């Protein structure tokens, strides 16, 4: 369920299990993900005020899906710690 007024996921098509599996060979995918995030946050009008990018890595980091993905949250003030 959404954690903020704006909450979307960015998921690479190529399978990368987690951030632990980012390599020199696939790092271009990560660069593309951040280009996509920049484009979408700008289109949604949240880039100026700010947003949060979340990636959970490993069991203790809260990762429940074995495919790298990023949550992007914005549209309100985001507190810390998140939970």
Regions found by a protein language model. Name each.
Residues 1-83:
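HIT superfamily nucleotide-processing domains
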